[in-house]
Amino acid sequence: MLGGSSDAGLATAAARGQVETVRQLLEAGADPNALNRFGRRPIQVMMMGSAQVAELLLLHGAEPNCADPATLTRPVHDAAREGFLDTLVVLHRAGARLDVCDAWGRLPVDLAEEQGHRDIARYLHAATGD
């Protein structure tokens, strides 16, 4: 773990969806679970539409089940709400739980349905056996 600016740079690169920068920082030893100044990890602030960023972070040890300290949302909640099936699948295959509620009692499937993301809702129902 390098700490400091490398870890902060990783969160920024993940948020911007900068795949090559994320790869370089991780290969240089940046901590995929380092908290930013808001108490969030790179996998929580990553550009949800970038399944490649998710894969890189997870490959280097990012925790797929980390919860937001205020809302209890996890990356799967964000991917389901925003409509990013590819990212959701990557997270799920890496061990992300689909059966955990956020602070308002909503599951990822609830968020997908609220937003009209039928393909994601179908995937989540199939994955959870509902």
UniProtKB/Swiss-Prot annotation:
Positions carrying Phosphothreonine: T12
Pfam family, one: Ank_2
Tissue: Expressed ubiquitously.
Gene Ontology terms, MF aspect: cyclin-dependent protein serine/threonine kinase inhibitor activity; protein kinase binding
InterPro entries per UniProt: Ank_Repeat/CDKN_Inhibitor, Ankyrin_rpt, Ankyrin_rpt-contain_sf
Keyword Manganese listed: no
Keyword Membrane included in the entry's annotation: no
Induction pattern: By TGF-beta.
Gene Ontology annotations for the cellular component aspect, listed alphabetically: cytoplasm; nucleus
Keyword terms: ANK repeat, Cell cycle, Phosphoprotein, Repeat, Tumor suppressor
Positions of ANK repeats: 5-34, 38-66, 71-100, 104-130
Superkingdom of the source species: Eukaryota
GO biological process, one term: cellular response to nutrient
Function of the protein: Interacts strongly with CDK4 and CDK6. Potent inhibitor. Potential effector of TGF-beta induced cell cycle arrest.
Recorded family membership: Belongs to the CDKN2 cyclin-dependent kinase inhibitor family.
Subunit structure: Heterodimer of CDKN2B with CDK4 or CDK6.
This protein's name: Cyclin-dependent kinase 4 inhibitor B
Species the sequence originates in: Mus musculus (Mouse)
Gene designation per UniProt: Cdkn2b
